[in-house]
Swiss-Prot record:
GO MF, any single term: cobalamin 5'-phosphate synthase activity
Identification of the protein by name: Adenosylcobinamide-GDP ribazoletransferase
Cofactor: Mg(2+)
EC supergroup of this enzyme: transferase
Pathway the protein contributes to: Cofactor biosynthesis; adenosylcobalamin biosynthesis; adenosylcobalamin from cob(II)yrinate a,c-diamide: step 7/7
Protein family: Belongs to the CobS family.
GO cellular component assignments: plasma membrane
């Protein structure tokens, strides 16, 4: 397999893991390739954001921006299978309902939705819709750019945990365990480069503020997860992604998408 085919193979692995988009049949998957595929998590975010933005833009011809935003949000959930939203809900249930590390991890593995998870999920979706709707009041076209940037940067933040933080879940059924064993400097470099590419889509001031704010948000999540469970799980990565995405939308609303 040539170098470009190897990279394409890794991208399709990342896409197949984090979305419901079918992978080509020729894709080769093993533990090492799953680890290396983390370099393209941000690029998958760009793809998901672009699909959502396309739906939003097309729907503007027939419906109001607020309805188009709902349809774009539904699209992103359908494309990803609600993968990250599920992680947010499980994390809220685990951290909110467990008293010990073992109890918190066991609750996260439970497929049932608890009160903490339901609250976190509903509030996150409502806040996401409200932030994007407010952004559309200033400039409806800016929502498309916000979706692309938010989906990309939030996945860059979440995926960077794999490089620096310990994986604590020992469940053989964990959805992210094959990807969580290690992340090399090459993977991290490509991941961060994707984030820089997304930052080029907004103004200089916005890019600087987003970088600083997401660094702080990441630090906060690291401290929280380390204190609560001693590291991260696949579910907490989903929570970090959702929190980072909301942070992007909030800052783009405050600052505007260009300067």
């Amino acid at each position: 397999m040539q170098a470009w085919q190897q990279q394409l193979n890794l991208f399709f692995i990342a896409m197949g893991f984090f979305t419901r988009i079918p992978m080509p049949k020729w894709i080769e998957v093993d533990a090492d390739k799953l680890n290396k595929a983390s370099r393209y998590f941000g690029l998958v975010g760009l793809l998901v954001g672009a699909i959502s933005a396309l739906v939003y833009t097309l729907m503007l011809y027939w419906v109001s921006p607020s309805i188009a935003i709902v349809l774009a949000m539904i699209t992103s959930v359908l494309v990803t299978g609600g993968f990250h939203e599920d992680g947010l809900a499980d994390t809220a249930d685990g951290l909110g309902g467990g008293w010990t590390v073992e109890a918190k991890l066991n609750i996260m593995k439970d497929s049932r939705l608890g009160s903490y998870g339901a609250l976190a999920l509903v509030l996150a979706l409502l806040l996401k819709w409200q932030l994007l709707t407010e952004l559309a009041l200033f400039d409806p076209s800016s929502v498309s750019l916000a979706l692309i940037v938010g989906h990309c940067l939030s996945r860059v933040v979440a995926a960077s945990f794999i490089f620096s933080e310990p994986y604590v879940s020992d469940s053989d059924t964990s959805k992210s365990k094959p990807l969580a064993q290690e992340q090399g400097i090459n993977e991290l470099s490509i991941l961060l480069a994707t984030g820089i590419l997304a930052l080029l889509l907004v103004g200089v001031m916005q890019a600087l503020v987003l970088t600083l704010a997401l660094t702080i948000v990441r630090y906060g999540f690291v401290r929280l997860f380390t204190k609560q469970i001693g590291g991260y799980t696949g579910d907490t990565l989903g929570a970090a992604q959702q929190g980072s995405e909301l942070t992007c939308y909030l800052l783009l609303l405050v600052l505007g998408v260009s300067w």
